[in-house]
Amino acid sequence: MKRVVILGGGVGGTIVANLLAKKLRPEEAEITLVDKTGKHVYQPGFVYVAFERQNPKKLVRDERKLLRKRVKLVLGEAVRIDAEARKVYLADGRALDYDRLVVALGARLTPDELPGFQEAAHHFYSMEASLRLREALEAFRGGRVVVTVASVPYKCPPAPSEAACQLDYYFTKRGIRDKVDIHFLSPLSRVFPLEPVNPLVEKIFAKHNIRSTVFFNVESIDAERKILNSIEGESVPYDLLIMVPPHRGAKVVEDSGLGDRGGWLPTDKFTLRTKAHPDIFALGDCTDLPVSKAGAAAHFQAKVIAESIVADLRGQPATARYDGHVMCYCDAGYHKGIAMSFDYEHPPVPPPLGLKDWLGKRFLNRAYWLLVPSGRV
């Protein structure tokens, strides 16, 4: 019997496991998913936790309940991948053999890479950090809020811009918007990562008095004086700092010598096989793919990988290809949203701003558990 091992119980790994369990007969393959915690977390909800619009408990479910019964769930942390021997070693000493391996471990937050980050900055890229940010926002009575990113790449590129819009909406509802200066700092030449959508976001910022500075790449934080310094030589003071932390690829990828300088796993952008080892697939945030690091990308990639593994195990040509498709929603506040859909060949069409796409995001947040991990959509 063939053995498929999947590392990571996020959206991508869960979909791959469930699709394989659906497509392959029990005698064809044993499907094992390895996850460190056994808890599946809906990360797009973190920003809503920070702004008191989401119950944290509703963002977490048991991974076992999301998997088909025949998928074997192993609780443990992968610490080494021996690609030549086709083995994965876990922290407790167990070793798992595989015929096909799927790496879906996401990105790793590394705030210690930027001195001063832990003392000075807040963020919403983990549940704990979102709850701390919520407390900081509740206590904030006025001053300058700076929103920026420590470095690129990072998960969910639109998230910082979205957070700036949420800050405006949040402080307006509290009746203290006139006492708050929101300043958005972008490392790019524009405020929004997707160029076709940037003019719309600039208009939103202008309408709601959100200041912006481009070409601001963070060099250091002076936590004592509350000043942020850029590589370009600018300095910006703050009273509250919200900063996306530095990211790296999965630690096991780095420790196994499989990653690039950032720890990202070099992956073919169409087949999603790793470039050095065709029997290892990778998807989502842990890869070096030229697409957004987002759950929506992993969602579409998972289906390609599942089809390819089924073909491999049955001795058939693997013809499935990933076209770079990503779809995401951005909440602009005031019950207005932006929907963006794009792929390698088709950039996003500048969308209208309206209620429909805001409702689309709200619907997805609520329907995620029913529709996405199972691979139904």
Stretch-by-stretch model annotation:
Residues F117-R141, S235-K303, E307:
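FAD-site-proximal beta/loop scaffold in flavoenzymes
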Residues G9, D92, L105-G106, V149, ...:
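Glycine-rich, N-terminal phosphate-binding loop of Rossmann-like dinucleotide-binding domains
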Residues Y169, A298-G324:
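Internal hydrophobic alpha-helix adjacent to the cofactor/substrate pocket in enzyme cavities
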Residues K336-V377:
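C-terminal auxiliary extensions adjacent to catalytic cores
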Residues R3, R70-E162, D168-G175, I242:
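FAD-binding core/adjacent interface of flavoenzyme oxidoreductases
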Residues P26-T32, V71-A85, L96, T172-P266:
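A Rossmann-like FAD-binding core segment of flavoenzymes
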Residues M1-K72, S151-E195:
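Beta1-alpha1 glycine-rich phosphate/pyrophosphate-binding loop at the start
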Residues V191, E224, R321-I338:
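Flavin (FAD/FMN) cofactor-binding core of flavoprotein oxidoreductases
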